[in-house]
Amino acid sequence: MRPAILLTNDDGVNSLGIWAAYEALSPIADVTVVAPATQQSAVGRSISIFEPIRANRIKINGNPAWAVGGKPTDAAIIGLYALKLAPALVVSGINIGENLSYESIMTSGTVGAALEAANQGTKGIAFSLQVEDQGDKFDDPGQSAQSFDAAKKVVRDVVERVLASGFPPAADVINVNIPSTIKGGYEVTHLARKLFHTGVEKRLDPRGRPYFWINGPLLEDAEEGTDVHAVRKGNVSITPITLDCTARTADEDTKKIFLK
């Protein structure tokens, strides 16, 4: 029997990235697409608790899918509980744009869906493809000019390896970032602290009232061994992630503050 995979994303069910992943995985698994109906980038692991969630059965290029009127986390939960799928893995992506560093995995809906699946008992793998032009992240994902050919090979190979060997026991999610041009092989990495400089741009609307854009250029350097450094070298970054955010090495110092 072929393994079952729940495939989701944050770019939306119409994204070329999710269908590239579908093409990569369909020959080796029974893949069910359950993804947000619309673009949901940068919503992280947020969840819809104040509005109903609708899931509609649709077809895209003849392939069945579920379009969920919510966030990536909602899609994962709907797939696991409402549709009663019992996948061997949840795969999220291929995201159009890299998801690197602490700041990105905390805001990424792609990684958020994989984390939610892991929290519900099914390990997840998140796949993201680097873009050379950061503006490409904000274009229509259904009309992306990105080439997914190399990324599809990575998706299939990574999933085949995990299905054959099992998930790393101490990890809950594997975050895979694929460079726009692959020059090397796989590199197991840890998260960099930041990917972008943080900036705020103030503008005035037509009535003269201020509004703000949060923006900032990419950082130019990154520590060796980090996901950012690996992708910039042209390596595929593979970062094991755990749900447990507890800073256990800080236990003793924290006790000195609060338990004296």
From Swiss-Prot:
It comes from the Archaea. One of its GO terms (molecular function) is metal ion binding. It catalyses: a ribonucleoside 5'-phosphate + H2O = a ribonucleoside + phosphate. GO terms for cellular component: cytoplasm. A divalent metal cation binds at D10, D11, S41, N95. It is found in: Cytoplasm. Belongs to the SurE nucleotidase family. PANTHER family: 5'-NUCLEOTIDASE SURE, PHOSPHATASE, PUTATIVE (AFU_ORTHOLOGUE AFUA_4G01070)-RELATED. Nucleotidase that shows phosphatase activity on nucleoside 5'-monophosphates. This is 5'-nucleotidase SurE. It comes from Methanoregula boonei (strain DSM 21154 / JCM 14090 / 6A8).
